[in-house]
Amino acid sequence: MVITIKDIINIPYDKAEKTIIEFIKNKIEEANLKGAVIGLSGGVDSSVTLLLTMKAIGIERVTALIMPDTRVTPKRDIEDALWLVKKYGIKYYVIRIDDIVDSYSAMPFFNINYNIPTGNLRARIRMNILYYYANLHNYIVVGTGDRSEILIGYFTKYGDGGVDILPIGSLFKTQVRKMGDYLGLPEKITSKPSSPALWLGHKAEEELGIKYETIDLVLYALFDKHIEPEKVPEHTGVDPSIVAKILEMHRKTRHKRLSPPIPSLPWVKEPIREI
């Protein structure tokens, strides 16, 4: 069996759309919330999520927050985010986080030039803003992570990973792009290179060192076709070293996908459970 990218992207997008819309609607109703707030970056994941949420509960119940740090956020991303909310008439706010980031200079160990801790700080600041707005209006925080990013742990813990629901969490990145086409998003958004923009010039595939098409091939083989890791190269044509790297990403980031661990005491069978 040879697996190609066509096997991954050839899914019934109409059924996926319907299922996700019902999921969003049900989760908001179950929580007895009034609406939804989404962090909109101008990329394909957040744009697709915004449109699906809008379809689920109506434009009037959705707010988009555009939160650039103008020193590192590409101007094009801001423009694309603004284009989208204006096209559909979605309520939005542009909140520059430059000064909020700078306020952390009160910490004696703060250094804005450290890309990873400062980049993650930007993601966590955005999470705080989203939850402040959600608490203020009794809204749900809708996450925009896709399945590829979740499985390899390519998100900030308690940053963009800090959300209430992940509507596109069952779609690989390549599928999200096709979903964007299906929903009528322009090519300038659906084909835009993935860019968290947590620091200047930050591009996902450059940081990962692997294209998403390759990542998705390997993840699809492992998780959907249940192929043993050592046999993935012969089924996908992906180099064994790349397969090993993707698998390592998944395993090393397991903690991001789980609740914080709790020690088991001899007299406590289940420290935390639902009743």
Swiss-Prot record:
What do the Gene Ontology cellular component annotations say?
cytoplasm
- CDD domains in the record: NAD_synthase
The keyword Transcription regulation belongs to this UniProt entry's keyword annotation: no
A biological-process GO annotation: NAD biosynthetic process
For Mg(2+), which residues are the binding ones? 45, 149
User: Could you tell me one molecular function GO term of this UniProt entry?
Assistant: glutaminase activity
Q: Which residues bind ATP?
A: 39-46, 144, 173, 195
Claim: Nucleotide-binding is one of the keywords in the record: yes
Entry keywords, A to Z: ATP-binding, Ligase, Magnesium, Metal-binding, NAD, Nucleotide-binding
Catalytic activity reported: deamido-NAD(+) + NH4(+) + ATP = AMP + diphosphate + NAD(+) + H(+)
- Principal EC category: ligase
Q: Tell me, what's a Pfam family for it? A: NAD_synthase
This protein's pathway: Cofactor biosynthesis; NAD(+) biosynthesis; NAD(+) from deamido-NAD(+) (ammonia route): step 1/1
EC number(s) from the headed UniProt entry: 6.3.1.5
| Ligand binding (deamido-NAD(+)) | 124, 157, 164, 255-256
NCBIfam families membership = nadE, PRK13980.1
Q: What does this protein do?
A: Catalyzes the ATP-dependent amidation of deamido-NAD to form NAD. Uses ammonia as a nitrogen source.
The UniProt subunit note reads as follows: Homodimer.
- Could you say which protein family the record assigns here? Belongs to the NAD synthetase family.
**Name listed for the protein in its UniProt record:** NH(3)-dependent NAD(+) synthetase
The organism encoding this protein is: Staphylothermus marinus (strain ATCC 43588 / DSM 3639 / JCM 9404 / F1)
The coding gene here is: nadE
